[in-house]
Amino acid sequence: TTQAKLLNELGLMQPVKDAIAAGLPVYGTCAGLILLAKNIEGEPSHRIATMDITALRNAYGRQLGSFYIEAPMKGIEGNIPMTFIRAPYIKEVWGDAEVLAEVEGKIVAARQGNQLVTAFHPELNDSLEIHKYFLSMINNK
């Protein structure tokens, strides 16, 4: 991805990995999920790769495959809005990674310690619940 190329070219990849390993809270949405995944199905690893997940890029198709749904997420009361745009999904979790949300049998949110990832874009909705969840992760270290 362009983001991974920039991280490498600017010499930031290893410092970011080190900061996450040292406990820096990080939240990756959509492409951020791809950057944090240790495995991407069918692709070599040139990413941050700090989270015990396997992701599938553009799993929901291209722009026309984008959609909105409300669904539950572990640790948040009620359903939350989820907007998917050319979104990946998590095919597999292992180690310390924990599934937080699924939509139609596909994993769309996960957590591993100080790392949170979602396949959807919470910034495109008015709900702040996922942001509050991330802040609670930081405050409850």
What are these regions (language model features)?
Residues 41-106:
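Pocket-forming structural segment of enzyme catalytic cores
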Residues 66, 86-141:
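C-terminal and late-domain segments of enzyme folds
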Residues 1-28, 36-39:
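Flexible gly/pro-rich beta->alpha loop and the following alpha-helix that scaffold active-site loops
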Residues 29-31, 51, 86, 120:
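A secondary-structure boundary/capping signal
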Residues 3-6, 36-39, 45, 94-95, ...:
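Short glycine-/acidic-enriched loop or helix-start segments at secondary-structure transitions
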Residues 1, 32, 123:
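Short glycine-rich anion-binding loops that position phosphate/pyrophosphate groups of nucleotides
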Residues 4, 25-26, 48, 82, ...:
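A residue-level structural signature of the nucleotidyltransferase/glycosyltransferase Rossmann-like core
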